[in-house]
A protein has these predicted regions:
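Gly/Ser/Thr-rich phosphate-binding loop
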Residues: 335, 350-352, 460-465, 474-533, ...
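Conserved ANL (AMP-binding/adenylate-forming) active-site segment centered on the GW(Y/F)…HTG consensus within
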Residues: 508, 532, 566-596, 613, ...
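Conserved pre-ATP/AMP-binding loop-to-beta segment of ANL
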Residues: 332-335, 339-376, 383, 406-412
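Conserved AMP-binding/adenylation subdomain of ANL enzymes
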Residues: 395-412, 420-462, 476
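AMP-binding/adenylate-forming catalytic core of the ANL superfamily
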Residues: 307, 564, 569-570, 596-681, ...
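Conserved ATP/PPi-binding loop(s) of AMP-dependent carboxylate-activating enzymes
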Residues: 539-543, 552-586, 622-624
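Structural core segment of the AMP-binding/adenylate-forming
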Residues: 251, 278-350, 459, 657, ...
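Conserved C-terminal "lid"/linker of ANL adenylate-forming enzymes
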Residues: 331-336, 617, 645-648, 657-661, ...
Length: 721
């Protein structure tokens, strides 16, 4: 009777909903229920809303607390001392009696809002007892007054949902025993819990709908964005201004039209992007570092007729010539001109629409699979293509990242990566504003002395960058400039050991290396504080599938193909403008994206990149990794920059060319510094340069480097092997 009353009361107060009760019925009789631990309400919620008479495995000390005893009478309790190994054995025997038992594998209430440490012992209990695992996510209770989250806006009566996931088993290899088996089962359990967190997240919606949810959760006055103008934007202001801009652009464009955006990292750019999305226009982010011809080509590929820009930006960035040339191909619309047409009445209506957006926006016909943005690939390995990402792609990647790392309210992201780059768009911009974080926009990553000062000034806690940029900042920064940083994540190019050790020694910060591509929205994998292996790029994001295509001449690695909810909607190709080409791997078919990277995935699931498939040379019938040869040069001369490319060779098929900034570099020195390395792995020619070709994103410009090497080879003046 008490259980019925409490169920009615909790449903009334917290509007509790239970999803997946059919999974509970499928689990059988011997069941270990594993749940995330969000608040002091969790045992009560599970005891009241789960069928049957379940048992709670609970810490002996906690079970003795007076305020908890009345609630424990609702269910059976299995007290256990986590410091005593016999407690786990007793729990195994208890489960083998065909009972349904609840345990919280984190061992404590979360203080991050994300999963905390998962104890291996819980996985071992499931493994050795033969019990079915039933993962359950409690969502919403972390925002109640009964949680331990100090950085979030707490509510008296938040909406709570209990997600019951499909039952599963922990299956370990028979040859694994002892501590290794315990660790392995704990590893499997952690993956199950992480997959649960993602599977129960809501990413099948539009970005603006997710933004409205974030405002409801964190409050309309919460500061979510800021730039060099130092006029912080709250959720209310961001939504209102985005509606203002969107309504003005709506009259000039058509539904579904790709609209060019030629603007720097700023709050105004964020307003433009969201404004376009609200009214079902697609922002196409133009890379202003590639010149007028490159931008015009991108506009042709994306069938872009209108480009939004700013006179102030064009002047400050000295892009007058590029703008004049671009204006011959498309219509340039300046934000300053749009602003003059905004009347007081428009502002009043816009403010009302912003306040009531959660009502009128839901009634609109929006699809999460509609295009949300067009990003143009950097062209590091060929001609740039338009990559179309849907709302669901971007939100899925956001939720995947959140399932792995505890980014959350209170964090300040210093975002200097341009929004025309997928890293800067999804991770630096969209993830923070949808997650109650504050994104501070800085217009250029190339200001190596200024950015450390900005990190110090704004108290940045999160920073994303490439190896090139992070290495440059480390040289310029004071040891205390990055005092407030919790996490620094590197991607887009290989993190060099010198950069890793410099950050650790000078700032006490361990860089987390990740991996991805524009086509994966962009994060494919990342090292995390709890799942880290130096030299790797981390483990795959939740709900991502992968296959390795064998490559002749390469052992213990293959070409990586991936599939998942964050895989792009499709390409816009230069030879077929405006026509969407869905992802399709030649090896594995539709829905699979061929990354073109040669990788090794170890037994723990960590990815080790060997290089691009195009970054291998075939010399005398042997496959040689250009990336591996670059690493030899980096090891020999860590203070310099190096690029290795391959060019045709009449005798051996291909030859290696090293471009370096090391003044006295030559092939003999490199060979002397690399004992035991086969001669085939050394460059045939070495050219010394003042600087190497680099793209605006910080990645090496390999096509540019190859073309430069060909010109230098033709002209001579190189050190030979």
């Amino acid at each position: 009777m008490l259980k019925i009353v409490l169920r009615w009361l909790l449903t009334l107060v917290y509007r509790v909903k239970v999803h997946g009760l059919e999974n509970y019925a499928k689990a059988g009789n011997r069941v270990l229920i594993v749940a995330n631990h969000t608040s002091f309400l969790d045992p009560l919620l599970l005891g009241v809303f789960l069928p049957d008479d379940i048992t709670f495995a609970i810490n002996t000390q906690i079970s003795e607390r007076w305020w908890l005893k009345p609630f424990l009478r609702l269910s059976k309790v299995f007290p256990m001392d986590p410091t005593h190994p016999l407690s786990l054995k007793a729990l195994i025997h208890h489960l083998q009696s065909d009972t349904k038992t609840v345990i919280f594998p984190e061992g404590r209430i979360t203080v991050t809002g994300s999963l905390m440490k998962i104890y291996d012992g819980t996985g071992m209990v499931a493994d050795k007892s033969g019990a079915t695992l039933l993962p359950i996510r409690i969502e919403g209770a972390e925002y109640s007054r009964f949680s331990k989250l100090g950085s979030v806006r707490q509510h008296w009566f938040p909406r709570i949902t209990i997600h019951i996931q499909p039952p599963t088993l922990i299956e370990t290899h028979g040859e694994v025993t002892g501590k290794a088996r315990r660790k392995h089962s704990g590893h499997i359990l952690a993956d199950i819990m992480t997959e649960m967190m993602f599977a129960t997240s809501h990413y099948q919606q539009t970005i603006f709908a997710a933004l409205l949810e974030a405002r409801a959760l964190h409050g309309g006055r919460y500061t979510v964005a800021e730039d060099l103008e130092r006029k912080p934007l709250s959720y209310d202001a961001l939504i209102a201004r985005s509606i203002f801009v969107g309504k003005l652009i709506k009259t000039l464009t058509q539904t579904g039209e790709n609209v060019g955006v030629l603007l720097p990292n700023s709050c105004k750019t964020l307003n433009v992007v969201l404004g376009l999305q609200i009214y079902q226009r697609v922002p196409a982010m133009l890379n202003y570092s590639i010149g007028a011809a490159g931008m015009a080509a991108a506009c042709r590929t994306g069938q872009i007729n209108i480009v939004l820009t700013s006179r102030k930006f064009i002047e400050l960035a000295k892009l007058e010539d590029e703008a004049a040339t671009l204006a011959q191909h498309v219509k340039l619309i300046y934000l300053e001109d749009l602003a003059t047409s905004l009347t007081s009445f428009d502002k009043i209506i816009g403010l009302l629409q912003a306040k009531t957006a959660r009502f009128w926006y839901k009634s609109q016909d929006y699809d999460a699979d509609d295009a949300a943005v067009v990003l143009f690939t950097s062209g590091s390995e060929g001609l740039p293509k338009g990559v179309v990402l849907s709302h669901a792609n971007i939100l899925a990647n956001h939720k995947q990242i959140r399932a792995r790392i505890d980014f959350g309210p209170g964090d300040v992201v210093l975002n200097f990566l341009p929004m025309f780059h997928s890293f800067g768009f999804t991770v630096g911009t969209m993830m923070p504003i949808l997650n109650g974080m504050t994104s501070f926009f800085y217009p250029s990553p190339l200001h190596y002395a200024v950015i450390p000062e900005m990190a110090y000034e704004v108290g940045a806690t999160i920073m994303f960058g490439t190896n090139t940029f992070l290495a440059a900042y480390a040289k310029k920064a004071h040891p205390y400039d990055f005092y407030s940083l919790r996490y620094v994540v590197a991607g887009a190019e290989k993190l060099q050991e010198t950069t890793r050790t410099t950050w650790l020694d000078k700032f006490g910060i361990r860089i987390l290396e990740g991996y991805g591509a524009t086509e994966t929205s962009p994060v494919t994998s990342v090292n995390t504080p709890m799942d880290y292996k130096a030299g790797s790029v981390g483990r795959f994001m939740p709900d991502m599938l992968h296959k390795l295509e064998p490559v002749p001449g390469i052992e213990n690695a293959g070409k990586l193909h991936v599939a998942g909810p964050n895989i792009m909607k499709g390409y816009l190709l230069p030879d077929n403008p405006g026509v969407l080409v869905p992802p399709c791997s030649a090896a594995f078919g539709e829905g699979w994206y061929d990354t073109g990277d040669i990788v090794h995935v170890d037994e723990e699931g960590f990815i080790h990149i060997q290089g691009r498939s195009k970054r291998f040379a075939k010399i005398g019938g042997e496959m040689v990794s250009l990336t591996a040869v670059e690493q030899l040069a980096i090891h020999a001369w860590p203070e310099a920059q190096h690029v290795v490319v391959s060019l045709p060779d009449p005798k051996k098929g291909e030859q290696l060319i090293l471009l370096t900034t090391r003044r006295d570099a030559n092939a003999k020195q490199l060979a002397d510094a690399s004992p035991g390395v086969a001669t085939i792995n050394f460059p045939k020619k070495v050219f010394v340069l003042d600087k190497l070709p680099v793209l605006a994103t910080g990645k090496t410009d390999y096509p540019g480097a190859t073309a430069l090497a060909a010109r230098l080879l033709e002209g001579g003046n190189a050190d030979s092997d």
